[in-house]
Amino acid sequence: MTTETFDGVRLTTKANVYFDGKCVSHSFTLPDGTKKSVGVVLPATLTFGTAAAEIMECVGGSCEYKLDGTDEWKTSGAGDSFQVPANSKFDIRVTEAYHYICHYA
């Protein structure tokens, strides 16, 4: 199931722009203090590092991803999610715009 809306959030209006604009996101905070971000990755192959554990939820498009320490690329499409441990990294390969919500653990 894909998350479509969040109610009552506090949104940071200035975008987080990474990799020369290939990834753009906005951070927001839920009423209970939970932090998340929502964004898009444009066609590219990128490597992201994590401080906190993350759950990447696909809300549109698709990607292939590979977690640190593995050689296996897996696919994530709309309604799918994958987990990334804290203090780790993952590779992401995108051929069409990949729209996501990042849930921080």
Curated annotation (Swiss-Prot):
It is an enzyme of class 2 (transferase). Gene3D superfamilies: Jelly Rolls. CDD domains: cupin_PpnP-like. Its EC number is 2.4.2.1, 2.4.2.2. Keywords: Glycosyltransferase, Transferase. GO terms for cellular component: cytosol. It catalyses: a purine D-ribonucleoside + phosphate = a purine nucleobase + alpha-D-ribose 1-phosphate; adenosine + phosphate = alpha-D-ribose 1-phosphate + adenine; cytidine + phosphate = cytosine + alpha-D-ribose 1-phosphate; guanosine + phosphate = alpha-D-ribose 1-phosphate + guanine. The keyword Nucleus does not apply. GO terms for molecular function: guanosine phosphorylase activity; purine-nucleoside phosphorylase activity; thymidine phosphorylase activity; uridine phosphorylase activity. The keyword Ion transport does not apply. It comes from the Bacteria. It holds the Pfam family Ppnp. Coiled coil: none annotated. HAMAP family: Nucleos_phosphorylase_PpnP. Catalyzes the phosphorolysis of diverse nucleosides, yielding D-ribose 1-phosphate and the respective free bases. Can use uridine, adenosine, guanosine, cytidine, thymidine, inosine and xanthosine as substrates. Also catalyzes the reverse reactions. Belongs to the nucleoside phosphorylase PpnP family. This is Pyrimidine/purine nucleoside phosphorylase. The lineage of its organism: Bacteria, Pseudomonadati, Pseudomonadota, Betaproteobacteria, Burkholderiales. The gene is ppnP.
